[in-house]
Amino acid sequence: MIEFPTIDIKSTGANILRLRKLNKLSVKDLQMYFGFEGPQAIYKWQWGQCLPSVDNLFALSRLFNVTIEEILVERESTKIFLLYTKILFRVVFESFIE
């Protein structure tokens, strides 16, 4: 079965917060690093309201000295949902064959 991974935005945000604190950086430090006018984007990432762009994820990975995969958190329920979808599809498909 091919699994389509999805990102857990809330957990990824918490992970960005954890990595920022682990590296002893403030929100202001990240704001200055990215050249943002204000801190809103950083807070939105940390609160899991949105994800950084690919470019910003790459920059975070370099700043935190981790891989992008170490920043992103996969949603666990994705695997359960895909299994449920596969079973449901099989049941519906088999009912058409009979």
PLM region spans:
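Short, charged recognition helix plus adjacent turn
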Residues: 1-6, 62, 72-98
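The alpha-helix within a helix-turn-helix
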Residues: 20, 31, 61
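DNA major-groove recognition helix of helix-turn-helix/homeodomain DNA-binding modules
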Residues: 55-70
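DNA major-groove recognition helix of helix-turn-helix
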Residues: 45-46, 56
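Residues within the helices of the helix-turn-helix
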Residues: 17, 28, 58
